[in-house]
């Protein structure tokens, strides 16, 4: 007997008698057939997004049609593959998917340096797995996708530093542009185009020399760095595969998103770490670039939820992921130092601008020409209207000040911990030198 919440039996004919085909249903005798976008194994064991219908009923001919408005993708345990799992977004996304019951697989590169700090607490869990792969190597990508055969792929791996892209444009293009193609083509070559959904992490840097404020899904791109140009290729190749091969693949155009796990080379983390170090007497001054640069900053933990939602829809679409609120680098500095009890006032303009401790008169922030980009994007401001309306996503779950405070509090604890560890090391060295400890 056939039974399904998502399908109903239209007709069953025994002994292999010829069936009929009408506009509303089909009769199949072949045990392997295509039907809409669903996969059925033995009529009952598994239902998921696919273009394959498999029915094993021996001599019986069955016709099954999908119930209208009743098909959901959350009917079975799913498997996700995350590239860039050791990064800020990858680690938060892994946590989210594990909470939702996924089997989570992540790719890491072979390196002499261990970058697993953000996911160390996940290793050892039964549904968390790591694989060696590199976006610059087609065979490693093909191998891991073929081994895991995921329902969803989240491509978060990238060379994501704008300044580095000027120094290493070829490497940036190989990873951020061709790397995306390698994933798409691997999925297609493995025959998974109908069963695997792909999320591509795109960037607000695509808008570059902005022609419209705020920026939405229809705003023209004007990339202003090798990084942005590479990401633009990634965006368009995803759309091309979606249209040419009917693949469920889409891009999330991510505006700046930060967290306690942000890399220390990014401007927001440089600010919060410097505020903590200056407060604890470990640093004298912070050097930055253009303090007037405007950014739309959100919380990474909120943004990975939007990534997941993008892959749960009936049809693939691209979305802007942003808060819809702008702040300057200067504002970020002000709130970060305020959190540690230092009130800043700013004097001067451009290269001459300085951030001064109002209480002591000490200059704590200066502008350095070393941090000015050859071409600087100054007015990125995202419009998340589509994501809010179609995905039901709330981009303002965490406010700007809450985000800054989370980051500063984390760095205050880190600096204090590092200081305590350094003190222990210093004392141990002294004891060893004096022969107190052997």
Where are these regions (language model features)?
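N-terminal Rossmann-like NAD(P)+-binding domain of SDR-like oxidoreductases, especially those catalyzing
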Residues: 57-63, 68-257, 301, 307, ...
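Basic polycationic patches enriched in arginine
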Residues: 8, 26-29, 44-46, 66-67, ...
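Polybasic, lysine-rich low-complexity intrinsically disordered segments
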Residues: 22-23, 30, 34, 47, ...
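Low-complexity, intrinsically disordered or signal/transmembrane-proximal segments
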Residues: 6, 10, 21, 25, ...
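C-terminal substrate-binding subdomain of Rossmann-fold SDR/epimerase-dehydratase oxidoreductases
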Residues: 12, 99, 106-107, 133, ...
